[in-house]
Amino acid sequence: MQIKTDYSNISFKNNGKLKLLIIVGTRPEIIRLSAVIKKCRRYFDCILAHTGQNYDYNLNEVFFKDLKLGLPEVYMDAVGNDLGETIGNIINCSYKLMTQINPDALLILGDTNSCLSAVAAKRLHIPIFHMEAGNRCKDECLPEETNRRIVDIISDVNMAYSEHARRYLAECGLPKERTYVTGSPMAEVLHSNLEEIESSDILEKLGLLPKKYILLSAHREENIDTEKNFISLFSAINKLAEKYDMPILYSCHPRSKKRIEESGFMLDKRVIQHEPMGFHDYNNLQINAFAVVSDSGTLPEESSFFTSINHSFPAVCIRTSTERPEALD
């Protein structure tokens, strides 16, 4: 794939406001940053860039539409043939973009490979603001854990969701003046989209009845790429389908679908694979499910929020560790 490194047609408005570059690359980043992006556009001269890390329509563009963000000004098309090439492309494309548009600051969120755009910003002496900083699961085998450590250390301002995260940052030796506990933006995002979530007709479209199906989402490397975990997880899913005798709707990422097909693993006939859904439809499925089984990082926040407004659902986190210990408190 020919990556894009010429951004001569991209520029800030130069309206006297501070110039802020926001870089995203995956669905969780788009969701969590959606309310923040809207506020930033009011106070800063903003450019929103997408690395292309999730290149499927249902993994990015549908969320820009659902969350009323408009499409990004920049698509980097940075996905390579393998992990090393993708990471290199993200840093290279980010570097080229920053040298051509000269932002006053970079805003990133989380622990994805797209966050490694911070490496380019650091070399160019561009201040880095990192949301969701300080998360740790203490499992060095997870690629996200490496990204977290790198980005936390090189960021100029780390915005943590919790006291747990703040303490982890302090353990890394980061000074207090570079760390702020801001809380998570997810409650604001969900609250502002609640009407659309509740009015979704996705159950009718799929022929499902409230509390008569299980919703499944499994996409992390630890569950999909590790053979032992993969077999264990989907064997358990088949047993779940047999025990409860109800449909299991699997919101299946393209990479996960390919892995299942290549493995030859036979899913129970009650497990229904479906392409990833939009933000409103997926959350409507969550609040109406008999149970939600997921390895998504947003599950603890979503289940907590919906419980607080009488839309509770049993949430089962299929992780060997979590970077959000506050969800277990």
Regions found by a protein language model. Name each.
Residues 2-53:
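N-terminal subdomain of nucleotide-sugar transferases
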Residues 54-70:
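N-terminal beta-loop-helix "entrance" segment that forms/cooperates
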Residues 19-24, 29-36, 43, 63, ...:
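Active-site and donor-binding regions of nucleotide-sugar-utilizing enzymes
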